Amino acid sequence: MTDLPDSTRWQLWIVAFGFFMQSLDTTIVNTALPSMAQSLGESPLHMHMVIVSYVLTVAVMLPASGWLADKVGVRNIFFTAIVLFTLGSLFCALSGTLNELLLARALQGVGGAMMVPVGRLTVMKIVPREQYMAAMTFVTLPGQVGPLLGPALGGLLVEYASWHWIFLINIPVGIIGAIATLMLMPNYTMQTRRFDLSGFLLLAVGMAVLTLALDGSKGTGLSPLTIDGLVAVGVVALVLYLLHARNNNRALFSLKLFRTRTFSLGLAGSFAGRIGSGMLPFMTPVFLQIGLGFSPFHAGLMMIPMVLGSMGMKRIVVQVVNRFGYRRVLVATTLGLSLVTLLFMTTALLGWYYVLPFVLFLQGMVNSTRFSSMNTLTLKDLPDNLASSGNSLLSMIMQLSMSIGVTIAGLLLGLFGSQHVSVDSGTTQTVFMYTWLSMAFIIALPAFIFARVPNDTHQNVAISRRKRSAQ
């Protein structure tokens, strides 16, 4: 990348800062949830919605981000994304109630949904094709550093300042990023096809109301009759989308995607798999603080080994999959993650705290292997004309399943615990033990899906080539 013009390198730095802001925010909040609950006068069992409101908004808005960038221009949309994210951060810090915080997090989510995919699109437009991989590696590196710093930084700010600062630190970075975007980034546009607004609205309504209904009457405060109504609305919306997308070449996501077996299995496995693994970043710091009495900073530091394990494993995932094949790797890592989850719970409740960093490092390795394998399995056999649509659908499903996972984790805590959980409660560790056991069971379930993946990797490649040549 040294032969790129200075202006292009500056533009890559802007995209990298956007990736860093978005990735930092996904992890920095987790260690602050108990302190937020105390400050806002809420039960810690309700604080999972702080994460859900952000991740669910990202899932809902993702399908529109690429079309908006092509229509309005990458500079305009990237600038808007940074402004919305920064304003959302300010409103989060100013929130005095949980409902205000949830609305502010949703605004953050709108910005976050546009920031990363539009950033990728920007790199694609400003960098020569032969240097695209090197450029993407450069801009995504800060996105890997964000999760590494987030938990510890969040714990440090909460312990020595207040939870408001985990949002306030975004403001100066956002202002600098917005100004730099206007000054340095070109406003590339492309000819766009008509946006499938009907399909977008049907999917958005279906995802939002079903996730809200899943939280139950205790979590939302809604009556059982209203919850039943939300479920009915969500199911009807999704069925209407399927009818809308059938034989519709302009559908948001073509149903032709599901003719590729590995895509169908990979997407189903990714959805189910990320529901389980999506619980872990939320539950781990909450358990360490409320269940074991760790300080916010100590709990944040304990999350670093998990991120290091994840980053370290990415270098050898390809060799592992090539050696053992997708089916064996995915089944083994799914069951392995369930066992590691049980191991974490056992060592924590036994008081073997010195073992926890090693267990969390192992958890990060297993989880990273499974994530990378799921992603490549899902997309590897798609024909070229469906690859972009399939990637967008996978990105949306990833965010949606994580929001559902956090919702289920909060629901399990509510089922097993009292309305208010404190460190002094004699039942607290029992509540968390039952929750972790349930999580381990949920994490193991996708193994049944992955067991149906064709076993031989080379055979899969040969089949995919015949499919591509036949279309």
Swiss-Prot record:
Keywords from UniProt, A to Z, are: Cell inner membrane, Cell membrane, Membrane, Transmembrane, Transmembrane helix, Transport
One Pfam family, please name it. MFS_1
Query: What is the topology of this protein in the membrane according to its UniProt annotation?
Result: Multi-pass membrane protein
Q: Which segments does the topology annotation call Periplasmic?
A: 1-11, 70-76, 125-137, 186-196, 246-262, 307-341, 417-430
What stretches pass through the bilayer?
12-32, 49-69, 77-97, 102-124, 138-158, 165-185, 197-217, 225-245, 263-283, 286-306, 342-362, 396-416, 431-451
List the ranges whose topology is Cytoplasmic.
33-48, 98-101, 159-164, 218-224, 284-285, 363-395, 452-471
GO cellular component: a single term: plasma membrane
Record bears the keyword Metal-binding: no
Intracellular or extracellular location(s): Cell inner membrane
Molecular function terms from GO: transmembrane transporter activity
- Return the PANTHER family for the record: BLR6921 PROTEIN (PTHR42718:SF46), MAJOR FACILITATOR SUPERFAMILY MULTIDRUG TRANSPORTER MFSC (PTHR42718)
Family of the protein in this entry? Belongs to the major facilitator superfamily. TCR/Tet family.
**Name of the protein in its database record:** Putative multidrug resistance protein MdtD
